[in-house]
């Protein structure tokens, strides 16, 4: 039996949940979306229901989300200015990260 990789998504917009979320959800034999983090509660609730994520794994606060590692992999599909900060936090927790481009709009962060 093959391992099912667990996935978390930060940023439930057109890329995070509409593109990546849909891709992972359609391949249930390989992936399971286990947690979501999104500032907009309406999007968070909608995709939580659509992807069957338990209520206790839906976050509007990134600090609460990053209190512990929640999955094998993390998709970071937030605003560009937030990418570096979130990616560093994710790597500290040991996530495999799929980071939307660009890494940062600020050359000083490279």
Residue spans of the language-model regions?
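N-terminal Rossmann-like dinucleotide-binding module
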Residues: 1-52
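Beta-loop-alpha module in the N-terminal Rossmann-like domain of NAD(P)-dependent dehydrogenases
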Residues: 53-110
């Amino acid at each position: 039996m093959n391992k099912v990789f667990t996935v978390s998504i930060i940023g439930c917009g057109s890329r995070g949940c509409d593109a990546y979320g849909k891709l992972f959800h359609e391949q249930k034999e390989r992936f399971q979306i286990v947690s979501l983090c999104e500032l907009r509660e309406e999007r968070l609730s909608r995709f939580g229901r659509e992807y069957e994520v338990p209520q206790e794994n839906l976050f509007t606060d990134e600090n609460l989300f990053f209190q512990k590692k929640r999955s094998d992999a993390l998709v970071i599909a937030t605003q560009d200015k937030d990418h570096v900060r979130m990616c560093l936090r994710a790597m500290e927790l040991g996530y495999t990260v799929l980071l939307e481009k660009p890494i940062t709009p600020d050359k000083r962060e490279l």
